[in-house]
């Protein structure tokens, strides 16, 4: 999901330089809500690789794959740009039957993917994802990259959840990789400090394990932390858009908060702060680094700093 959020400014860039173009976005079915938030995306082409690979030989799956291939071929695109650089995304780009552009094999996560493209570009994999994706699209289409003109362009109406009083903070505590989790005790301490400042906290989850983790945090700060019901990505975006601030580990929802322009603090534990720091049009900060676990005091200080910056912006 983080890759999708990081690619959103590309849609704005392309429409800025080619306002009359029709822009399609290929996206996995579980993440369609994210590009739908952008007014610069005209059409979605939906894949289901996570589901397909579980039953790849069934006739229904083969039919779905054929339908996607047909849709891509019949669209008669002028160009396809693969921002993700995986074998499966390179294959999808090839299905369109037109020029496909991707990363060179020295700068791609799965080097075999480079062999599927019509043209490759040496866009460094050492760039932060937002800059990498914007650079790739700019070089592929021949327009200048303007780093100061970052625009995610999300169209989201804020929503305060039932049972939550404003102001509230959105805490994105879960992630698919255990090494990126911040210790539960530190989340509890942050939630208590927020409560002392009159700020409730809301938590999100996507499976039973994540819900249990959220409930353990909430039980340590009774009445001040609300574990929300399972929500769609669209609904989560609306809740985040209504928050006073967002604090979260390196996960897609945290980057979504930054994309929405909410004062945000990213907590890095098991990834590179150089590559995965938050990038926003508004006030944001990142604390910690790979193997460097930040203290609650650092997170709270960063939160107060971004809130102060947002207040004078």
Named regions from a protein language model:
Residues 1-313:
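Catalytic machinery of carbohydrate-active enzymes
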């Amino acid at each position: 999901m983080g890759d999708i959020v990081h690619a959103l400014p590309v849609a704005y860039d392309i429409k800025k330089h080619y306002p009359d173009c029709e822009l399609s976005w290929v996206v996995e079915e579980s993440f369609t809500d994210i590009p739908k938030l952008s007014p610069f995306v005209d059409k979605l082409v939906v894949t289901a690789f996570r589901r397909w690979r579980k039953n790849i030989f069934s006739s229904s799956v083969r039919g779905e794959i054929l339908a996607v291939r047909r849709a891509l071929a019949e669209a008669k695109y002028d160009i396809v740009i693969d921002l993700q650089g995986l074998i499966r995304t390179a294959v999808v780009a090839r299905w369109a039957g037109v020029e496909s552009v991707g990363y060179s094999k020295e700068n791609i996560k799965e080097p075999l993917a480079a062999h599927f493209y019509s043209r490759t570009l040496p866009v460094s994999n050492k760039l932060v994802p937002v800059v990498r994706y914007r650079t790739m699209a700019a070089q592929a289409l021949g327009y200048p990259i303007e780093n100061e003109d970052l625009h995610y362009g999300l169209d989201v109406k804020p929503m305060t959840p039932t049972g939550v009083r404003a102001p509230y903070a959105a805490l994105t505590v879960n992630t698919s990789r255990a090494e990126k989790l911040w210790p539960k005790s530190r989340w509890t301490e942050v939630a208590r400090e927020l409560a002392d400042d009159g700020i409730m906290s809301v938590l999100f989850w996507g499976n039973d394990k994540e819900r249990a983790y959220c409930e353990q945090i909430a039980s340590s700060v009774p009445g001040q932390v609300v574990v929300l019901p399972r929500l769609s990505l669209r609904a989560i975006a609306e809740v985040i858009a209504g928050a006073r601030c967002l604090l979260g580990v390196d996960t897609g929802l945290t980057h979504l908060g930054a994309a929405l322009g909410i004062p945000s603090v990213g907590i890095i534990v098991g990834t590179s702060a150089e590559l995965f720091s938050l990038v926003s049009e508004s006030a944001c900060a990142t604390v910690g680094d790979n193997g460097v676990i930040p203290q609650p005091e650092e997170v709270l200080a960063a939160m107060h700093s971004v809130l102060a910056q947002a207040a004078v912006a």
